Amino acid sequence: MIFNRYARGGGGGGLGALIYVTVEAGSTVTATMGTMTRNAVYSQGVYVIDVPAFGDWVVTATKGANTATATISVTKAGMYEVTLSYISKTLNDNDWATIKSVADESKGANYWSVGDTKQITINGKVSDGLTLSNYQTWVYIIGFDHNSAVEGTGIAFGGFKTAQTSGIDVALCDSGYNSNKTSGQWFNMNNSNTNAGGWSSSRMRSTTLPLVKSALPSELTSVIKTTTIYSDNTGGGSDVASYVTATQDDLYLLAEFEIFGAQTYANSAERNYQKQYAYYVAGNSKVKYRHDSTATAVFWWERSVYATDADLFCGVNTNGTANNHGAHYSSGLAVAFKI
């Protein structure tokens, strides 16, 4: 994975073009172009390759089962520098910066699989009824370059699980769970029982999710990208196609069609701009449990309004089926984001 590269004055023998490779000591480093291969010499902490011809050289570093590559365009005499980093096929062994570098090149599926997990620690107030202190949980891949023609590229993650493998799917729940809240900061969609304004104007989007984001680790939030998502952003009780418009979001909730691959209560036009996430295409459970009581299944929110009702937003029922709830009810929270 390339972190930086550039040419500068100087050079070696022959052609006068050298590639300097910074990578873990003990690696084997080569450069290849067509039928030509050159081996690197380790010198003073870097690997040096003296290339005999101009062109695009593929630099490969290997160490054990790990491999890292970069393509260097050698166009003139001089020194070309590249830093390579090995990418672990165990998602959790990579830092967020490395995951972002893979996502930026749309190569996530080359290393990881849908459902792979990475641990995070949440610290801080996320609701008037929930403050988390060193709460360790796992986010998991729900798609690679999901719906990229509409939403752009990236690795999409969902929350949350209790363990790296075979973990229980959980949603954050505050002390107001399953009760209506008309003031303060809770895991409700709005402080009044209305879906007017849809997703874009919801209190969940404008106030709650930014608060949740502030409690996430900075090394994660620094690489979360803004993504284009489509939702019913009008609400009010009518199933009107023009109500479905785009917003730009970093943290967001999944929509009904993105979870179920079918429309039950949501605006029937949302599906024209959405795709079901690969995690759910694969048949994974849609049931989530309380983060603090993992034997208790919960209703968790979606961003879709119930199109033909002025009071309700869609969600996933305790048995994993499509359902809906009054907008002012505090319910389970499971965020999504893209890197």
Task: Cite the ranges covered by each PLM segment.
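Short, low-complexity N-terminal tether/leader segments at secretion or assembly junctions of large
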Residues: 1-16, 66
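A short, amphipathic beta-strand motif
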Residues: 16-25
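Short beta-strand/loop motifs in extracellular/secreted proteins, especially
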Residues: 25-29, 55-57
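Short, acidic Ser/Thr/Gly-rich low-complexity loop/linker segments typical of extracellular
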Residues: 33-51
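A glycine-anchored, Pro-Gly-centered beta-turn/N-cap motif
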Residues: 45, 53-55, 78
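A short, solvent-exposed beta-strand micro-motif common in secreted/extracellular proteins
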Residues: 53-64
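Structured interaction patches on ligand/partner-binding surfaces of diverse proteins
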Residues: 64-86
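Collagenous Gly-X-Y triple-helix signature in extracellular proteins
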Residues: 83-339
